[in-house]
């Protein structure tokens, strides 16, 4: 729902920064817990601090509800400037679409597959990078874990930078740029030049992942229509979670029964 709200009412810049904040939060949580544990406090103290932050954020959201209601969609803004069709005021609210109706929309199946594959790549890279670096490249477990964390840092920093790049480039160009960087990063990992090269490849893959997710979501109302965007974004998220949950374990089976060296080929 939040993705659809932003896609309809804000620019691609805001969508990129919204998802950048996901990376900030995902990084801050373990950091807070690490500080708590290193200070000798019990683990539930860390959860208490995070819970306090959640309560504060919830209060801010509740207090800001009037601002959310007053924000116009792109269509509403055009109407207020006199650019809407004459019968736009009589347009009925969009009815909920069934899965069959959604998949019948031209391009819906393709975007579902896109989200499945993208999230499969992102989650597999994030979960298995450290194991690949340790078992295949011979890097120590501590260093491998640090290197793997740079993948998510690459996504977070990349989405922050993407917010500025979207001021100049449209969603389609940003998605293409991201895919090119992902391919370049995976090919870099494949180079037999040692752990530092694999590290560089992981960071490049992370930077490439940065614009894909937010820009595909933001382009949904434009590609499929504002009346269908909520339904399309819903199935996109479902496809994303299926890819996230299913494909990393599949690679785990391959790594266990064949070889962990298949990691970059699996990402391709």
Predicted regions and their residues:
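Small-residue (Gly/Pro/Ala) motifs that create kinks and tight helix-helix packing interfaces
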Residues: 25-38, 130, 162, 246-255
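Juxtamembrane intracellular "pre-TM" segments in multi-pass secondary transporters
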Residues: 72-111
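Helix-to-loop junctions at the C-terminal end of transmembrane segments
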Residues: 158-171, 255-256
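Cytoplasmic helix-loop-helix junction between adjacent transmembrane helices
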Residues: 1-21
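C-terminal transmembrane helical hairpin of 12-TM major facilitator-type secondary transporters
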Residues: 169-216
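Extracytoplasmic gate region of multi-pass secondary transporters
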Residues: 105-149, 153-157
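Symmetry-related core transmembrane helices of the 12-TM Major Facilitator Superfamily/SLC fold
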Residues: 45-66, 262-268
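A late C-terminal transmembrane helix in Major Facilitator Superfamily
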Residues: 226-260
């Amino acid at each position: 729902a939040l993705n659809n709200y932003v896609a309809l009412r804000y620019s691609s810049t805001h969508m990129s920064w919204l998802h950048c904040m996901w990376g900030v939060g995902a990084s801050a949580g373990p950091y807070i817990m690490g500080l708590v544990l290193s200070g000798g406090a019990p683990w539930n103290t860390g959860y208490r601090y995070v819970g306090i932050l959640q309560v504060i954020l919830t209060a801010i959201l509740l207090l800001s509800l009037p601002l959310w209601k007053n924000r116009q969609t792109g269509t509403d803004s055009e109407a207020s400037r006199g650019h809407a069709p004459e019968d736009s005021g009589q347009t009925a609210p969009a009815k909920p679409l069934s899965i069959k109706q959604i998949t019948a929309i031209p391009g819906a199946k393709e975007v579902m597959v896109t989200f499945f594959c993208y999230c499969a790549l992102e989650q597999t890279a994030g979960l298995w990078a450290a194991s690949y670096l340790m078992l295949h490249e011979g890097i120590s477990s501590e260093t491998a874990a640090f290197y793997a964390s740079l993948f998510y840092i690459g996504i977070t920093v990349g989405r922050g930078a993407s917010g500025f790049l979207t001021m100049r480039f449209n969603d389609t160009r940003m998605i293409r740029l991201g895919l090119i960087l992902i391919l370049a990063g995976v090919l870099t990992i494949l180079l037999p030049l040692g752990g530092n090269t694999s590290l560089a490849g992981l960071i490049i893959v992370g930077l490439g992942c940065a614009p894909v997710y937010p820009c595909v979501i933001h382009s949904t109302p434009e590609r499929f229509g504002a009346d269908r965007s909520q339904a399309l974004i819903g199935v996109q998220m479902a496809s994303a979670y299926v890819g996230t949950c299913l494909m990393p374990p599949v690679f785990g089976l391959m790594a266990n029964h064949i070889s962990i060296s298949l990691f970059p080929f699996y990402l391709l």
